[in-house]
Design a protein with these regions (language model features):
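Alpha-helical packing segments of well-folded alpha/beta enzyme cores
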Residues: 26, 76, 231-235
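Glycine- and acidic-residue-enriched helix-capping/strand-helix junction motifs
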Residues: 12-23
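Conserved strand-to-helix beginnings and helix N-cap segments that scaffold or border functional pockets
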Residues: 16, 73-74, 100-103, 222, ...
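Glycine-rich beta-alpha loop elements in corrinoid/cobalamin-binding modules
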Residues: 29-31, 37-167
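Short, glycine/serine-rich, charged loops/turns that create anion-binding
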Residues: 10-12, 96, 251-252
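Short beta-strand segments
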Residues: 4-7, 42, 62-67, 91-92, ...
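Nucleotide-activated donor-dependent transferases that construct or modify glycoconjugates
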Residues: 1-14
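Radical SAM [4Fe-4S] cluster-binding motif and immediate context
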Residues: 173-256
Length: 256
């Protein structure tokens, strides 16, 4: 099974380009569970994504969804859906309302997306891939995915919103393999992308301007200090072209 994950960014000049750490976590988690059953390919460039799509058609495509890449994801997603309407396409990220009315409105407007994964998506995306893996190849379709309920995800099926926000929160973040230590970020580090590293997730505060300020994400969890040190050392040795490390924590310094 071939899966494309895209965290797209404009690349007409090399300024403020960051590693796709988010889809890296999702890939590392599913790859650890499924092994060689799935071939994962990660993309930042829309041109590289579409070139790869023309050369080899995937069984599933996933997009990250942020304010800065919504247009690029729309362009690529609509192109693929027009070319192959049965292609399953999923999306995740904070650029969406979290109430059911907002989710339904988003899915009806963004109709190239079959299933939206809410909050941290490692477990939900693994469940989707595992579901499709169990289907005959001719049943790995958009319609089949949309009719299947995956915890933490929503779809429009038979003109009705289905799904739930039953987010599976990991109790131990170290259960999610590192996208750096597994080598998934190596191509991007080699190209000079700034590495985004997390030391913890979650925030107990409810700031209205922040995507972390919701109850589903208010428990603070941390990666082990040993893992963080290993990641920082790995990045320092591998990032020859970038001069900075970006911390992606919701609230850096909140934990001792």
């Amino acid at each position: 099974m071939l899966v494309y994950f895209a965290d797209l960014a404009h690349d007409y000049f090399k300024v403020n380009q960051y590693t796709p750490t988010g889809i890296g976590y999702i890939t590392a988690y599913s790859k650890n569970k499924l092994g060689d059953k799935v071939d994962f390919r990660l993309f930042k460039s829309v041109n590289k994504l579409l070139d790869a799509y023309e050369n080899e058609k995937p069984d599933l495509v996933g997009f990250s969804n942020y304010t800065w890449n919504a247009g690029l994801s729309k362009f690529a997603g609509e192109f693929m859906k027009k070319d192959n309407p049965s292609l399953p396409i999923i999306m995740g990220g904070p650029n969406i309302r979290i109430d059911k009315e907002g989710i339904e409105e988003f899915l009806r407007i963004t109709n190239y997306v079959d299933t939206y994964c809410m909050f941290a998506g490692e477990h939900s995306v693994y469940e989707i891939i595992n579901f499709l893996l169990k289907q005959p190849k001719n049943m790995r379709t958009s319609a089949n995915l949309k009719s299947h309920v995956t915890n933490g995800c929503y779809s429009i099926s038979n003109d009705q919103l289905i799904g739930n926000s039953n987010y599976t929160r990991p109790e131990d973040l170290d259960e999610i393999p590192s996208p750096f230590l597994t080598g998934l970020m190596d191509p991007f580090l080699k190209d000079g992308y700034y590495p985004i590293v997390e030391t913890n997730r979650g925030c107990p505060f409810s700031c209205t301007f922040c995507v972390w300020g919701i109850s589903a994400l208010n428990k603070v969890l941390k990666f082990s200090m040993q893992r963080v040190k290993e990641e920082l050392n790995y990045v320092a040795k591998s990032s020859f072209k970038s001069s900075a490390i970006v911390l992606g924590d919701a609230n850096f310094g909140i934990l001792p």
